[in-house]
Amino acid sequence: KGFHFSVLKNSWLVGFSDQALLVMGPVVADAQAQLQQQMVKYLKADEDEGITASPMFERLETITSPMAMVAQAQALPEKFVAPFTLGTPKDTDPSQVVIAAEMDVKDGILQVKGETFSFNKEIDEALKKAAQTYRPIKGSYVKSMPADALAGIFMNVKGEQFLPMMQSNRSLQTLLMGINQAIDMDNIIRSVDGDMAIVMPSLTDNNMQMTMAAKLSHAKWLGDVDYWKTSCPAGAKIANWGKNAYFYTDGKTSFYFGVTDDKQFFSGSDQLMAQYAVKPSNHPIDAKIQKLIVGQKLAMVINLAKSSGSDGSGKDDAISTVTGLLTPVFGNLTSVVYTLKVKR
């Protein structure tokens, strides 16, 4: 009684009374009746018991932006969780990490300026400490991300401080698992000092591709490559590819890596990708997006137009999920740019 319901874009339920408006979703048609019952409970609840009394809602109230979001990291597609959980203790559950962000849409770009925190004191302290590790991004690699790449993460760090954060991050460890058995990535990361970019051209489970570029303070680890060659797991090998450049293969995974004369680390899943990791792309991401990255402490770019593989095959599930969530609310978007908001 007194509640009205409507369905928005076939997947969002809108419920309203004289006092409140509530939108929930996305939800499949079969589950809409059940969700409607849940929404009635929320709309009936008084202020002391309802959703507005929850800690997450209280946090939402503190954000002054016209459009704001508070979400658990686990609500995001798994493939995009890494930047938000960087710095948390090793076995942190993504449900314990919360993102509070202000949002704005300009020129088809959803700009999300957020900070991560936790209601768990130990995790919250770790996140605050991690935020201090990031330095302003100079923009060395913003032109290296091609416009058709799926996602890119940009930062400026001192490797020795960043390494423990990377080691305790499950998503990044999974990303590097195959390579780490033969190449001492930890030592490579330790030598980083400056801008670093990880770009993922595509992100299907059976086709993990990535490039990594970084400014180094030194490349002493090049002296260890001969040892790495002799200690490869069975069926794998490391071979020379060019001056201070090598490739690793185990039949399934390939990884090309090397150091330029001016101490830049470059790497990629194939020869071309690796070489171009530190060079400007012929078709880089939009200049507006580049501008949003430079000067920030941490940035992630997600290309929403990248909805199918280069051969036109199926949609990327993670991207479809994100677009499905955002399009009904914001209209057609081309990209999402997330930047870490650092408290002054």
Describe the predicted segments one by one:
Residues K1-M56, R190-K291:
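Single conserved position on a long alpha-helix in the C-terminal lobe of the eukaryotic protein kinase
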Residues G2-K9, F80-S95, Q132-T133, I179-V192, ...:
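Short, solvent-exposed secondary-structure boundary motifs
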Residues S17-Q19, G25-V27, L43-N156, E160-F162, ...:
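Leucine-rich, highly hydrophobic segment in Treponema pallidum outer-membrane-associated proteins
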Residues I51-V81, D91, K129-K229, A239, ...:
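Extended non-catalytic domains of envelope/secretory-pathway proteins
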